[in-house]
A protein has these predicted regions:
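The C-terminal output helix
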Residues: 148-154
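Cofactor-cradling patches in redox/metallo enzymes
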Residues: 1-146
Length: 154
């Protein structure tokens, strides 16, 4: 899948950073540091995007875990190119329904180029109602705003 370069105006970048600061303040008031789990499927670009996501999460005050059960935020960064990636992601989403039942405040996000494909996004939204957020790489820069909206609407 071809990547498109977008120039983000400084005012929009500043707005996203303000969301990071607000979330960091919310998280600083918690008795324990909240944790995030980021799982990457696919190519080197996905690895780079996952690092950006981890950077945002760090700015928001999250630590990291390799256990989905411990995480307040789970991010699955998907790939539409690699063989069997779609089946693996959908299988893992099915398993996460049990985790979400035990931790209903947990935020589950699916992003990446697979999530950008309309038929896949529709399938996730219809079949995996425990998923809170589905977005493609073209709006990755708005991740702090998406998380802020989810946190403040609960």
């Amino acid at each position: 899948m071809e990547r498109i370069t977008t120039t983000i105006p400084q005012a929009d970048i500043d707005r996203q950073l303000s969301f990071c600061r607000e979330i960091a303040q919310i998280n600083a008031a918690r008795p324990q540091q909240p944790l995030a789990f980021v799982d990457t499927y696919g190519c080197q670009q996905n690895e780079a995007d996952s690092e950006r996501i981890r950077g945002y999460l760090r700015q928001m005050g999250y630590g990291f875990t390799d256990q989905e059960e411990e995480a307040q935020i789970i991010v699955l960064n998907t790939c539409a190119i690699r063989e069997h990636a779609e089946q693996r992601v959908l299988g893992n989403l099915g398993a996460l329904v049990h985790v979400k039942r035990r931790h209903p405040d947990q935020i589950i996000c699916v992003c990446g180029c697979m999530a950008q494909e309309q038929h896949v996004a529709d399938k996730i939204k219809q079949s995996f109602r425990h998923v809170d957020l589905v977005f493609g790489p073209h709006v990755l820069w708005k991740f702090p705003e998406f998380i802020h909206t989810l946190l403040t609407s609960r």
